[in-house]
Amino acid sequence: MPFKHGTILSIFPVLVMILAALCATAEGSNSGAVRGTVTDPSGAVIPNATVHLINQVSGLDRTATTDATGQFVFANIPFNPYRMTVLANGFTPMSKSFEIRSVVGANLSMVLQVAGSSQTVTVESTGDLVETDPTFHTDVDRELFTKVPLESESSSLSSLVTLSTPGVSADSNGLFHGLGDHASNSFSVDGQSITDQQSKVFSNQIPADSIQSIEVISGAPPAEYGGKTSLVIVATTRSGQGITKPTGSISSSYGSFGSATGGFDLAYGNAKWGNFIEADGLNSGRFLDPPEFTVFHDKGNEQNVFDRVDYSLTPADSIHLDMNYSRSWFQTPNSFDNLNVQNVETTGPNNGSSSSPDFVNVGNTDQRSKIETINISPTYTRIIGSDSVFNLGGFVRRDDYNYFPSGNALADLGPSNLQTSSISQYRTLTNAAVHSDYSYVRGMHNLKIGAQYGQTFLRENDSLGVVESTYNSPCMNAATGNPLPGYASPSACPGGVVIPNTNYLPVLAPYDLTRGGSVYKFSGHTDVKELGLYIEDQIKADNWLFNLGLRGDVYNGLTSATQTEPRVGIAYNIKPTTTVLRVSYARTLETPFNENLVLSSTGCSNAVLSPLLNCTSGVSGTLQPGFRNEFHAGLQQAFGKHLVFSGEYIWKYTHNAFDFSVLGNTPITFPIDWHNSKIPGYALRADVPQVHGFSAYLVASSVAARFFPPQVAGAGATVGQAGLPFRIDHDEKFNQTTHLQYTLSRGKALNGLWGGFNWRYDSGQVAGATPCYGVTDANTPCGNSSTTLGGQPAIAMVDTNIPPTINPVTHASVALPLTADEEFQAGFACNGVKATPTTPLPAVCLASQFTSSLINIPAPNAGDNDHNPQRIAPRDLFDASIGKDNIFHADRYKVNLDLTAINVTDKHALYNFLSTFSGTHYVTPRALTAKITLNF
């Protein structure tokens, strides 16, 4: 679909500002260089001076030595405040604080005084712990996060964001929910924007070993960021520039579940060029988070190669190139329900189309996935004088996703509420874009102007066949209305007790594998075009800082939208009390998720797929972008030199709020739109910078993810159609992470001994499929399961997430029952008797006797979809690491040894239960890993 003349005119004010400054066509680099010269009072240069650069909060710690001309350079320094200390023989040490807020970087002149009787350090400014910045964010450098115990090697970047950032609700398989939204997060890696989902069931993440530092923006997004902005993770990769001696490491680890890793990295270069390369591999018996605490059919492996090249063509011109290839292969974890699957015999006289089909053991479910990701991102940079920098870059990123069914498709049969069809999928997602930005820093102004044009090429190829013999039965029992297995068509129903099924769908008959059918093949494609233009100026006036920005977005895919988006923020630094007050506002255009976007937008107009979806009359098939207003207010407060606190209140209103639904009862998920969402909440962070080897931080948040029906776009959904607000399944009342870290630096034997400790508390996400009792609340979540037993309130063991069907004979409402194993997974018990994988609870249990060890169930008549839904039980998880750096006390080749324990107490806990989007998942059981690293 081409861009229209009116589309460009609608964002003309922004376009004029861009074209006025740029002659070419979003994000620039995420870092700048710190350059400087060290001299004495007469102006003579001082060679061999030691220059030390630190950020106490993020943990960045770098050291350089001045050359023969007294100059030094720190390349690839993320945007942040820093303190620099210079030491030289015969001179008084000097310390200076400054900030990097632009790719222009900083050029410092450090004048050392000749040493006299006093050796007092000269300090030109203070206030390292607080930032006069209107945007709430979290900074973490590699020096800090390498000692944080992380749960998953295959999604360690997600684990790092979850454990270090307030406002993040942890989910399974590397998925995290930022500030109440499903996955509206984006990564900016060295200026390249990645807005597609990075959960390891969708894509391969950039390897954590390639990351130097991250900044997670939780506040109102600056104008340069678009697409998905609930959380913006700004990542700066490692560089070899300026490292004149080959430096790197070789590592290997082994741990629980047979998990083994191996990897190496190497950095080398000089003042003009540099190269950093890393490669790593993982093989694990627990690759994904399974639906059982016991692990089986959960093997997986992953390989990563990342290379960064920096080269200075001239003192003013340089190029930068990122290249990455990742591949993962993994099994879909099985539950006990997936073992020894019973299904119809497809051959012989008693086959699935006969009047009396035989049921046989068709084996275990064996579904698998393979994902390949390739990424190439070059950038050209030109320094224009001492106050301007121009960047021009591009990137291509491609995900190839394959989902493979079991060798015997009939073995893919799962519980009726989870999987009734066998599927295969080959889906590709290719992003290609060019971007440019111009930065100018002079006086009180820090100006940035930029643009990005990109296209996303989506190709979806799905194959589907029904494997449940009663899903589309031609015949039913005349007395009960229950569908019957067997019979090829309604004309084969003999009459009497067996009559034609009035709910039979002839359009599905050719694709019923239990009756000799074949798979249905769906193919869809589209090209999504996006243009983003922005201008922003950071104005510093005494103790004030003003962020003034304007962004224009054009989205043109299966639908089109334009949006002009003001982004503004104000911060004020009360220096006597080291307090920073801030407020900010952003208008954003939230782009639809690309995963299975074509299927979601066209499924209800497809004759075969439409019956599998809960398509609602009046709902637009095509997903629309979301339009959001968000407001933030917060403060940052330093307490002395060893504690800094940040807090933020957030309020977001989104029109067309995104969620996910599922194709029938299959593993294929896709995005949908609800009418709107209202998300208030708060986020807190406290940091204790390193003092005498000890450091700590705490992050905490509470976010209410309130969504409002009706569904307005996409294929069918399963919840929230009562017209009243509900909490989305990733809503969580409260979560927090406390991290403690200590490093010894005394004595030869103890020097380099360190320990790290995490305490993670989650109050629990919504578990809407859990049966409960409630008949008095109009917004009850318990309607499907509320019944009576002997005149007393009782609960039916059914999935309350899935709307009931109407029995064609009795006209009774029929909900899908839970299996014995599903009840066991949820820790259900009736009158103290627990369910087992093979022994279910009674079909109906008195409400007063129904309990769960893993889910909080509302008291009878106390449940409410908005104010008191069913939730996963709160959990406390403890992780610890201990290690020894340079265990052999060597000078060149240093060996590190460390041991990590995840879930030290072996806590049995769930991430979620029968989530519409992802099913049931347990947290990791106790897992021990030993790692050895050779550094050189």
Regions found by a protein language model. Give the residues of each.
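Periplasmic N-terminal accessory/gating domains of Gram-negative outer-membrane beta-barrel systems
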Residues: 91-113, 117-222, 232, 236-240, ...
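Flexible loop and strand-edge segments within Gram-negative outer membrane beta-barrel domains
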Residues: 296-298, 316-383, 398-415, 419-427
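Periplasm-facing N-terminal accessory domains of Gram-negative outer-membrane beta-barrel systems
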Residues: 2-3, 12-136, 193
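Gram-negative outer-membrane beta-barrel transporters
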Residues: 540-545, 649-653, 672-769, 845
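Surface-exposed extracellular loop regions of Gram-negative outer-membrane beta-barrel proteins
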Residues: 335-337, 558, 572, 576-630, ...
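Membrane-embedded beta-barrel scaffold of Gram-negative outer-membrane proteins
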Residues: 391-395, 401-403, 573, 614-615, ...
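C-terminal beta-signal and adjacent terminal beta-strands/loops
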Residues: 760-858, 872-877, 884-936
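Transmembrane beta-barrel wall of Gram-negative outer-membrane proteins
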Residues: 254-283, 293-334, 368-391, 566
